[in-house]
Amino acid sequence: MLDKVDVLIIGSGASGAAVAWSLADTKMHIVCLEQGDWVKSSDYPTNGRDWEARLFSDFAINPNRRARPTDYPINDANSPIKVVNFNGVGGSTIMYTAHFPRLHPSDFKVRTLDGVADDWPVDYATLEPFFAENDRMMGVSGLAGDPAYPPKQPPMPPIPLGKSGARFGQAMNQLGWHWWPSDTTIATTDYEGRGRCINLGHCTPGCAQGAKASTDITYWPHAIRAGVELRTLCRVREITTDEHGMASGVIY
């Protein structure tokens, strides 16, 4: 069957979800293909006593170990970076630690400041409204006033430091180093239908409670209500091109 659409998105993770949501009000025919499926809150490891064991099986960060039907093998033997991903609605926002810092203004000028790589073609000020919008959509918690950034106000107050965090802070104070609690996507108050964190379990393998933001519970409900079509269990095997070498469609 040959489907014609206005916008085709491959993958429902962080970028795919945000693009789908941002275009939804245009009323174009938008389809997103996701090779995984929806993950029910009852499926997350933190619902059971065996949650630590499941971090090495069906919720391992490495797809080679996880070996779900929706996964595929990845050879990272010669890579200094080991893959961390998840195949499902929400993509790798399902499986991350909720650590959510913005880039610093200096990160956009590494060539100018440090003589390495290249400067970005845009600067922090240009992207700041989009950072703020994403913070609002994902529900960021943090402490305002960090002098390493231009002024910003996270939507929610920060999570408590905890004993280890406080110890690190004390050590850096003794060394005269600047430190600041990092922004996270962990709800510290009730926010947009999500309850605040109750320390149900480790953040990485998905949050059964929904306190940790993932795009399946933040961007996608809005996008789908606005008319975006999300097709799950659809693995793209080829991107087709036209006579000019431009992408024209997919085979899945």
Regions found by a protein language model. Give the residues of each.
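N-terminal glycine-rich phosphate/pyrophosphate-binding loop and immediately adjacent elements
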Residues: 1-112, 116, 121-125, 129, ...
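Short, well-ordered loop/turn elements at secondary-structure boundaries
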Residues: 3-4, 25-27, 82-83, 88-90, ...
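Glycine-centered flexibility motif
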Residues: 17, 36, 90-91, 139, ...
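Generic structural signal for helix capping and beta-alpha/helix-loop junctions
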Residues: 40-42, 189, 240
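Short low-complexity, flexible loop/linker segments enriched in glycine and/or proline
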Residues: 45-49, 194-198, 245-248
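Conserved redox-cofactor binding core of oxidoreductases
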Residues: 56, 71-73, 99-102, 111-236
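Conserved beta-strand-loop-beta-strand element in the redox core of flavoprotein oxidoreductases
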Residues: 238-252
